[in-house]
């Protein structure tokens, strides 16, 4: 028999267990509308949760750890974000959910960072993130971001403005000019106050996998070195610290490799362009297809790559000279301005001057490239050096600088118009469609960049055509033509009209899309292999979206200019402008 003491102890134990369960229920009641998902833990020993089965004690301990210092409102905010990231609504976030969410919910954070973010959220490498792990990540990240914000807020007014952003970035070795600092502030600012508070800063950077400000600023600051088959006039900017750490040469190597592969893959377009520039006229009408057949019949498939070797070889010296000159010119301008940052116009001038210097240095290779592209089968049987010696013997040193003047003059309109139209399109987009953001998303930016580059080529193409004709003047088989720039302009205008200045422009445009795409992919691969940190505005997964975007933009620009702005606005391209409020919609 059970004595009274044992019965009393049993009754007392049951009462204590009941009180514990009631206390646990009270703790769980803070979940609000979600308590029904957790309260079944009070009855069975094991219950199904998002990651299988856990014990009641473990679940309650998890809840206590998670909600010990969190308000119900904060919990609701995090739960709302979690539900939005859970694309397939299965109660967990996996790599597919996160990748899709980054693309559609937070385009300012590249989707190629999804694996890094997943590793931060789920350090156990389980491949799935439950609500507790996500909440822990958010709370920890917010704390780190709060400390970072406090460091930036120099006057302790709870706001970070452009001046504070510039000063802090300068202190950590990543100086910003006024334009870039303003861009970063405007990107995070949701109220139009020209400053950022802690809440805006945390919301904007909530999912970014690094809490180090240098990484964050580098992430915004860099632009990809994309080779579109034409020579870029404005080199990339690098901070003093990046120069010391050797990041600059890795970017240049990646850009050079990307350019080499891109130019080799699109060499047939380039040869067709050069051939049409020199040989097409009113009396000798040639189109892309007729030129394609003619070149193939004369030399076969291999003939389409004539001149490509020297076109690739000149990438290295041209890039190196341009970069060194640009860096020295910036230093000279900075020395005269003191502590004031270099403006966009000054960078344009420095870049154009650096481009002119580099072009002057490697211009003989440019002339040889044109001559080699126009040669017939059997005309280069003893190598490039012998070919250059033959040119020198027959025409003298001046032959290596034929067409130099139009080439030099063409640099200014190309670089200036490219930059001006890019900024104009971007501002127009922001003014009409992005009221709370200073810059569109990656697809709209690529569309703007493609079209600004197209306009730059349109403006400078007559100079490029005259340059090519002057370079090939001694080997042309047609009637004698003027051997000066102004004489060529007059000759073309009188004999062929305005359209004569745009011979060969079709293959020039056709090569833009494959050139950009190939260069982008190769650049990303080489940069990653060299250990350069990810700091671009997108990843390889954006390529398949960029292709139709760019093609459509070019077609719209030429044939439907009035509707072009509607295209880049995201209506025709179906670019969802969800980035305008970042994560503010999660708190509605």
UniProtKB/Swiss-Prot annotation:
Compartments it resides in: Mitochondrion inner membrane
Residue windows of the Solcar repeats: 246-332, 342-428, 440-529
Membrane topology field: Multi-pass membrane protein
Stated role: Mitochondrial and calcium-binding carrier that catalyzes the calcium-dependent exchange of cytoplasmic glutamate with mitochondrial aspartate across the mitochondrial inner membrane.
Bilayer-crossing regions: 252-269, 307-326, 352-365, 403-422, 446-463, 504-523
Molecular function GO labels: ATP transmembrane transporter activity; calcium ion binding
Residue stretches making up the EF-hand domain: 73-108, 109-139, 140-175, 176-211
Protein name as annotated: Putative calcium-binding mitochondrial carrier F55A11.4
InterPro entries xrefs: EF-hand-dom_pair, EF_Hand_1_Ca_BS, EF_hand_dom, GDC-like, Mit_carrier, Mitochondrial_sb/sol_carrier, Mt_carrier_dom_sf
Origin superkingdom: Eukaryota
Biased composition (Polar residues): 1-14
Record region (Disordered): 1-25
Family stated for the protein in its record: Belongs to the mitochondrial carrier (TC 2.A.29) family.
């Amino acid at each position: 028999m059970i004595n009274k003491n044992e019965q009393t102890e049993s009754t007392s134990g049951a009462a204590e267990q009941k009180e514990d369960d009631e206390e646990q229920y009270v703790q769980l009641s803070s979940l609000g509308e979600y308590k029904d998902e957790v309260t079944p833990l009070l009855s069975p020993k094991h219950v199904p949760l998002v990651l299988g089965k856990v014990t009641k004690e473990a679940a309650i301990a998890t809840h206590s750890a998670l909600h010990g210092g969190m308000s119900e409102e904060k919990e609701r905010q995090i739960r709302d974000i979690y539900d939005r990231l859970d694309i397939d609504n299965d109660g967990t976030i996996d790599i597919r959910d996160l990748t899709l969410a980054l693309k559609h919910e937070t385009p300012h954070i590249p989707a190629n960072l999804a694996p890094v973010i997943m590793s931060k959220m789920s350090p156990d490498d389980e491949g799935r993130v439950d609500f507790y792990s996500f909440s822990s990540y958010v709370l920890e990240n917010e704390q780190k971001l709060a400390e970072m914000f406090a460091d930036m807020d120099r006057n302790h007014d709870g706001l970070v403005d452009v001046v504070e952003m510039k000063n802090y970035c300068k202190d950590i070795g990543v100086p910003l000019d006024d334009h870039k600092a303003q861009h970063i502030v405007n990107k995070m600012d949701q109220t139009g106050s020209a400053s950022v508070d802690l809440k805006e800063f945390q919301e904007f950077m909530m999912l970014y996998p690094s809490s180090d400000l240098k990484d964050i600023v580098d992430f915004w600051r860099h632009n990809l070195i994309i080779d579109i088959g034409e020579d870029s006039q404005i080199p990339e900017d690098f901070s003093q610290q990046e120069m010391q750490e050797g990041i600059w040469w890795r970017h240049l190597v990646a850009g050079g490799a990307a350019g080499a592969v891109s130019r080799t893959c699109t060499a047939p377009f380039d040869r067709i362009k050069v051939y049409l520039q020199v040989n097409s006229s009113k009396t000798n009408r040639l189109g892309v297809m007729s030129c394609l057949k003619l070149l193939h019949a004369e030399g076969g498939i291999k003939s389409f790559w004539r001149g490509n070797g020297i076109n690739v070889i000149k990438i290295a010296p041209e890039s190196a000279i341009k970069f060194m000159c640009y860096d020295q010119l910036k230093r000279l301008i900075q020395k005269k301005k003191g502590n004031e940052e270099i403006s966009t116009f000054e960078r344009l001038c420095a870049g154009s001057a650096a481009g002119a210097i580099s072009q002057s240095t490697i211009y003989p290779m440019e002339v040889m490239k044109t001559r080699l592209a126009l040669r017939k089968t059997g005309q280069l049987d003893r190598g490039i050096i012998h070919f250059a010696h033959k040119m020198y013997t027959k025409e003298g040193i001046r032959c290596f600088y034929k067409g130099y003047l139009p080439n030099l003059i063409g640099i200014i309109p190309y670089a200036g118009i490219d930059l001006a139209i890019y900024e104009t399109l971007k501002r127009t987009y922001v003014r009409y469609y992005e009221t709370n953001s200073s810059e569109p998303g990656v697809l709209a930016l690529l569309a703007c960049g493609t079209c600004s580059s197209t306009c730059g080529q349109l403006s400078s193409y007559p100079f490029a055509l005259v340059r090519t004709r002057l370079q090939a003047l001694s080997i042309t088989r047609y009637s004698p033509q003027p051997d000066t720039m102004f004489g060529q302009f007059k000759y073309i205008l009188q004999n062929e009209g305005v359209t004569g200045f745009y011979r060969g422009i079709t293959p020039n445009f056709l090569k833009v899309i494959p050139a950009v795409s190939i260069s982008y992919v190769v650049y990303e691969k080489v940069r990653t292999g060299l250990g350069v940190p990810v700091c671009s505005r997108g990843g390889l997964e954006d390529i398949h979206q960029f292709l139709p975007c760019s093609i459509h933009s070019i077609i719209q620009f030429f044939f439907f200019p009035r509707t072009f702005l509607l295209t880049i606005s995201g209506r025709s391209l179906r670019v969802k402008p969800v980035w305008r409020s970042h994560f503010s919609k999660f708190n509605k």
